[in-house]
Amino acid sequence: MSTEIPDGICYNNITEINDFCEVIIMLNNVKNGSVKILPGVFRERMDVNRRYLMELDANCLLQNFYLEAGIILPGLQVVDDPTTANIHWGWEAPVCQLRGHFLGHWISAAAKLIASDGDAELKVKMDGIISELARCQELNGGEWVGSIPEKYFTRLINNQYIWSPQYVMHKTIMGLSDAYIYTGNTQALDILVHLSDWYIRWTGRAAETNPHAVYAGEEAGMLEVWAQLYQLTNDEKYLTLAKRYADAGLFRKLREGRDSLTNCHANASIPFTHGAARMYEITGDSDWLEVMKLFWKFAVTDRGMYSTTGMNAGEFWVPPHLQGHFIGSNDQEFCTVYNMVRTASFLLRYTGEKQYADYIERALYNGFLAQQNADTGMPTYFLPLAAGSRKKWGTKTRDFWCCHGTMVQAQTLYPEIIYYTDSERLIVSQYIPSRFEGEVSGHSVTFEQTTGMKYYNDQAFFDEKDDGQMSRWLLKFSVKCADNAKFTISFRVPEWTVGAPEIELNGEKITARVEDGYINITADWSDGTLQIFFPSELRMERLPDMPELGAVVDGPIVLAGLISADCGIKGADKLSEQFMPQLEHTYGTFPWRQNSWRTRNQPQSVMFRPLYEIRDEEYTVYFTGKDGE
């Protein structure tokens, strides 16, 4: 199915609406809708997510907005048996103070799928939901369009406890913004125009009576949405709102060089960086970019992380380099994975530094994929890393955790983080089967990448490889141009690459310069093919505070042992001698199944599989590694 999709908004030319000073952006996003995800594990995860979005009942998605607007749905005026009521439960239940948060995530995810896939059926459903939100807004007096009552914000001003009302409203605003950005739904923007008038008054009242209230109720995402709306409309009232949310204490502490994260709620702090990113884009003030870099320093560089990229336990930042002390059942909240990937993607665009793309790659496999059930699309709130763990999956209508919402968004993010451009290049940042159709250096280009992953032997493309070896990192690319066009294609060399990448251009082996972690190939393109092999090897990544414990990693992919306890690994300094590939798949049938391994030369033989393939099995990630045995 397909439908004509408007270009929407692309942030390639931010300086056009910036009246302050020049914004330096090293890498530009490609246009919405220019990237199509091709068959493979990422496409499969997008598809199961799309099925779930369509499966959910629109009335249930809107239930809390209806209740707030005084609309009673048939069958819900009197409920005799709650178990049979057609209603969403968990955090969406009408008695929960976070009720209604999920719909904003749903709208955002739907909008991005519509933009990337031209999904007409999903667009009809999304447009209908937005129309109903406009109806609710009218019944509420023309401004408020909340799933929660306005009085929750009065409680913030009065310093009375209430569970994160700004978090809830941020999701609604975010979803409506994305509906306008990605699909051109002007009704969504109209709703926001009127809702923002309510916020102008509320923040003004708060500033006069209790300025702290603006920074209460988990408000971290608010700065981004108001700054983004200023980008979209150039309406000064949104800039006013952005400025009212721009003086968070986190920013002051970061500028002072203080660790403002340790033992604090992780996901309540990460979205501040997204707001800083938008403020950098609308002001050009490099101080905002510096704040983002300082955040990354305290969150990642100086803190360390699990091999899966997790940096938190029980929702709180783990103290620097003490990850081993916090291994348990509540590691790596998924919301933090998603939001850190967004932070990394901003920093990648602004700086061009490869480290952020490497981080994103690892988070995709060990967060986005590992924390989504491949069958149902459901998330796991945390990613347990203790020995003998099992993932706890959410249900389709009875949980609706925060991570439930970020997961449906996460599975639509892939088209935005694979390709970038600058004035002369197409940059390939992630290796996900996909097709890009757009403009590079003034030329119309179609670029496609697929994986050559399969069992290969001495007849394989690289005949010097050992017999019986398997790799997913044999990558194939095709380039087609409307005319003969000279430009550069830059390919990220992953941080885990061992030795020199091996390259063929149009069937001929070539060498290419590597600069700042990228292979740069400049050619006169018309119709061309490329193949690149990134050599990798198994390695053990040890915990800084418990170096006796380590995770087995293959490229960017964390492996899990199918065992209920830490049985130890002898000879951990030479894992290639302790693990043998488990040739259990037919790669023509499962072209994106990652390698499985089985230990050898060990007291106990253990199967290892990618953590993202684990569903209901018991597993162990960190093992005692003994060198030289």
Description of each model-found segment:
Residues 34, 242, 292, 357-366, ...:
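C-terminal beta-rich recognition modules with glycine/proline-rich loops and embedded aromatic residues
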Residues 151-232:
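A conserved hydrophobic secondary-structure block that centers on an alpha-helix together
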Residues 96-115, 164-180, 215-231, 264-281, ...:
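Well-ordered alpha-helical segments within folded domains of soluble proteins
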Residues 25, 29-32, 36-39, 113-127, ...:
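Structural helix-adjacent loops and short alpha-helical linkers that scaffold large soluble proteins
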Residues 498-523, 538-545:
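Solvent-exposed beta-strand/loop surfaces of large extracellular or lumenal domains
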